[in-house]
Amino acid sequence: MADEKSPTRISPHLIAASRSEMRNNMKFRPCIDIHNGKVKQVVGSSIKDEGNIAKENFVSEKGAEYYANLYKVRNLSGGHIILLNHKDSEYYEATKEQALLALNAYKGGMQIGGGINADNAREFLDAGASHVIVTSYVFSDSRLNYDNLERIYKAVGKERLVLDLSCRKKNDKYYIVTDRWQRFTDEIVNEEFMHKLAGYCDEFLIHAVDVEGKNNGIERELVKILGGFDEIPITYAGGVKSLEDIEILKKYSDGRLDFTIGSSLDLFGGRISFEEIADKY
């Protein structure tokens, strides 16, 4: 493993000042989750590579391109496309094909994650992704792998890299999980760790995996931790089931966090109006 190091970074004071101006201006970040070649909403903690299994909340009859076009028409940028199949899965190519169709439909409008590394990242950027989202590649062997972090940083640059710090709670702390949220690492999400990574990436994406897809409300403790961090934008995903949850998210994060809604959105069989969210946020 390489020595711990960090690229040249903008003054944290300037970044914090910029982020402070964004308070109370939370932004809705739409999503397209693709599993077994279909747009789906799944329970995050249920995903199993073996057998390509996941507990499904919603399976769309429409392709990923439909949703990308919808987000484009509503000028909703900065959303993410997630490939939920492992590269060795028999369904991976079908899932990837759907993702590429979505990127082509909304060039520069969406980020993409799922199996991204320094060798294939450029393919997805060239296909139209604004950013690549990376987790497992930089958290190999249960720890932060600085060699791989440097490789992806050099391959795409800070401005086009999103680090996914999706996490699950264990022993009262939030540990980053990898491999489609199946494997715990030894890295804990806290302000110190996020500060260490902020110089490498443009944003963080963080799914609260324990509540992802369960419609039980947001992970408030995690939101408090994330809301205390000012250096780069953070998108929170997991458990938003109502407009009230968005207000709670705003309160607990002081309006700093952007957010994603999945299975609770009427686009995906839920009750929250997509049109209302798109208009308001």
Task: For the regions a language model picked out, list residue spans one by one.
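Active-site mouth loops of central-metabolism enzymes
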Residues: V39-A64, M110-G113, K173-V189
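Alpha-helix-loop-beta-strand connector modules within alpha/beta enzyme cores
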Residues: E90-Q111, R151-D164, I218-T235, K241
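Catalytic cores of alpha/beta
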Residues: M110-Q111, I116-G128, E221-F229, T235-Y236, ...
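Conserved, mostly hydrophobic/aromatic
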Residues: D33, F124, L163, F204, ...
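Glycine-rich phosphate-binding active-site loops on the catalytic face of alpha/beta enzymes
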Residues: A127-N145, G239-S242, D254-S273
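N-terminal active-site wall of soluble small-molecule enzyme domains
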Residues: V73, S77-G109, G115-E123
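Glycine-rich, proline-tolerant flexible connector loops at the mouths of alpha/beta enzymes
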Residues: G78-A94, S136-S142, H207-N215
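Conserved anion-binding
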Residues: S46-I47, A129-L205, V211
